[in-house]
């Protein structure tokens, strides 16, 4: 699966524009005063301004598989990295996933992850910078607890998605997709790892390719 565009909402549009352009040094365009488009390698991330809520999301950005330590050093000069109590480190070592990650908050409270996946052939030799943000790699999806299993079955059937082969299904956590792109799915109010921040259901549209077809996933679903 490849995530092409991630459309999100924010109550802090100008602050995010400054953060992603000046702090993370990513290309940011503002097609109008209510929207920004952030170029993340092969993906686009679009924030549209909202005044009715303060949405927040979880997403991960893929980096070269040999650059997690450099990415940590680069980021630590720009943001406060989140500490993982279970690893006693600010680098999470997901042994079963063959991956390592670092996490931080952006100014809107989004939980941002940089992930290096060792089973992808994408090593890089140049010094780490935001030019090595390769794509949006994970998107967190949230469903109501009472519809959790039903909604996952709907995703599997409608978009030809399958369970990530490195993550057995758990009652409160699922991963659909592959190393190139994942939906990480939790029930509403479950804390986003590695924080104590409960997940919420906020509007999003994900444009992605899977098994040779292109899809648009809009959440929450419209009746």
Predicted feature locations:
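Glyoxalase I/VOC metalloenzyme domain signal
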Residues: 1-3, 9-29, 39-87, 105-223
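Long, internal scaffold/assembly segments composed of regular secondary structure
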Residues: 31-35
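Short, small/polar residue-rich loop motifs at catalytic or cofactor-binding pockets
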Residues: 96-99
């Amino acid at each position: 699966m490849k995530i092409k565009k991630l459309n999100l909402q924010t109550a802090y549009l100008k602050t995010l524009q400054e953060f992603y352009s000046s702090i993370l040094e990513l290309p940011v365009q503002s097609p109008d005063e209510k929207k920004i488009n952030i170029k993340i390698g092969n993906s686009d991330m679009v924030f549209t301004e909202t005044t009715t809520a303060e949405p927040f999301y979880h997403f991960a950005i893929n980096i070269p598989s040999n650059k997690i330590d450099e990415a940590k050093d680069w980021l630590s000069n720009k943001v406060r990295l989140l500490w993982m109590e279970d690893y006693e480190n600010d680098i999470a070592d997901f042994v079963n996933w063959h991956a390592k990650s670092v996490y931080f908050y952006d100014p809107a409270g989004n939980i941002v992850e940089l992930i290096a996946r060792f089973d992808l052939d994408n090593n890089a030799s140049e010094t780490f910078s935001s030019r090595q943000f390769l794509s949006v790699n994970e998107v967190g999806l949230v469903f109501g607890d009472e519809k959790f299993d039903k909604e996952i079955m709907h995703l599997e059937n409608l978009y030809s998605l399958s369970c990530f082969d490195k993550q057995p299904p758990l009652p409160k956590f699922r991963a659909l997709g592959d190393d190139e792109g994942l939906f990480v799915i939790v029930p509403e109010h479950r804390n986003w790892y590695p924080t104590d921040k409960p997940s919420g259901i906020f509007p999003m549209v994900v444009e992605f390719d899977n098994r040779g077809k292109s899809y648009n996933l809009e959440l929450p679903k419209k009746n």
